[in-house]
Amino acid sequence: MADGGASPAQQEGEMSAAGPGLRRERQHRGSGRPPSARDLQLALAELYEDEAKRQSLRSDKPTTTKMSNSKGLKIDSFRSLRKPERSMSDDKENQRFYSGDSEYRGLQIWGASNNPSKIVAELFKEAKEHGAVPLDEASRTSGDFSKAKSFSGGGYRLGDSSQKHSEYIYGENQDVQILLKLWRNGFSLDDGELRSYSDPINAQFLESVKRGEIPVDLQRLVHGGQVNLDMEDHQEQEYVKPRLRFKAFSGEGQKLGSLTPEIVSTPSSPEEEDKSILNAPVLIDDSVPATKIQIRLADGSRLIQRFNQTHRIKDIRDFIIQSRPAFATTDFVLVTTFPNKELTDESLTLREADILNTVILQQLK
C-alpha cells in the first residue's frame, strides 16, 4: 500500500510472534469496538503464561554453579563441612573437623564426644582397622598365648672360684603387656587410676591407640621391645578402684642371736587364745614369771597356752591330752622347731629346757 502499511501476511506474522494476547487486542481493534475488561484479563493471563514458559526453558540449560548442600559432593576442604542444616544437638554429640592445606590433602579430626559408648565403639573400630584382632581369634592363631612364660630377664652369673667374681648378665628386651580397660566414665591401664575421656591428654592417648601407635605415656616402658596392648570393653560398668593385692607379712619370725632363738610369733586373736585356755585349764601363779607356748598338733591344729616358767614339759603333754582326748592313746613326742630337737627329759622346767615363748611340735611315733 502507498501509505507504507504492512501487508496482511506481514501483520499475521507479527501477531503470531507477539502471542495470542496481542492477536486478541488487534482483533478487537479491527472490529472497531473497544476491548472489554474480560478481554484485558485474558490478554494479561496469556502474557504471564508465556513469560513463565520462557523462564522454564532457560532453567533447563546446564550451568557451572555447584550446589552447596548436595549429599553427593566430596568433602575437599574445611569450609565444605559447615552444613547449616545440621542441628546443634548433633554438633554436641560428636564433632568432626577437616583440616587441610589443599583440595586433595588433609586430616580429619574427631572432637570430644559426650557419649562414652561412641568413643569406645570408634576406638575398637579404628584399632581393628590397624590390625587389632579380638582376643578369641588371637588365642586361636597363637598357640603360646595362654602358656606361662619362663623367666627371661637379667641375672647374675656366679663365680666358679674364689678369684672370679659374679657378673650381671643382661637379658633380652622384654615385651610390655598392658591391659586397657574402657569404662563408662573413663578408662584405666591395668589396675591403675581412672582417666577421664574429656581430658585432652587422655584423648591424645586414645588417638594414638586408634592409629596403632605407642602412646607417649607407654614409650618410657619400652626398652627396645614392643608393647602388647589388650583392650577390654566395660562400658556398661562404672569404674571401681581395685583392691590392693599387697598383703603384709603375717607369719612367724625367729629372733637371732642365741643358740636356741626365741620365736617371735604374730599376736593371735583374743577369741583364739580364750578357746585354747578353755580347752584345758592350766593353773597360773601370777607371782611367778609366765610365758606363752604355741603347740602345733599332728592334725594340723594349734594350741596357745600360758604357762609359768616353772611348769615342766610333762605339763605341756598333759595339756595336749586334756585339750584333745583323742591323743590319750596315741604315742607322740614333743619337738622344738629350730633347732629340731626332741624333748626327751620331760621333768625339766620350761626355763631349764630353754623353750620360753617358742613353738613346740607334736610328732606321732
From Swiss-Prot:
Keyword terms of this UniProt record: Cytoplasm, Cytoskeleton, Endoplasmic reticulum, Golgi apparatus, Nucleus
Domain SEP: residue ranges: 175-240
Biased composition (Basic and acidic residues): 50-63, 73-95
Annotated spans, Disordered: 1-97
GO molecular-function terms, A-Z: ubiquitin binding
Domain (UBX) ranges: 286-363
SMART domains (alphabetical): SEP, UBX
PANTHER family referenced in this protein's UniProt entry, alphabetically: UBX DOMAIN CONTAINING PROTEIN, UBX DOMAIN-CONTAINING PROTEIN 2B
GO biological process: autophagosome assembly; Golgi organization; membrane fusion; nuclear membrane reassembly; proteasome-mediated ubiquitin-dependent protein catabolic process
Places the protein is found: Nucleus; Cytoplasm, Cytosol; Endoplasmic reticulum; Golgi apparatus
Protein family per UniProt: Belongs to the NSFL1C family.
Pfam entry (one): UBX
Protein name: UBX domain-containing protein 2B
Principal localisation: nucleus
One GO location term (cellular component): nucleus
Record's function text: Adapter protein required for Golgi and endoplasmic reticulum biogenesis. Involved in Golgi and endoplasmic reticulum maintenance during interphase and in their reassembly at the end of mitosis. Regulates the centrosomal levels of kinase AURKA/Aurora A during mitotic progression by promoting AURKA removal from centrosomes in prophase. Also, regulates spindle orientation during mitosis.
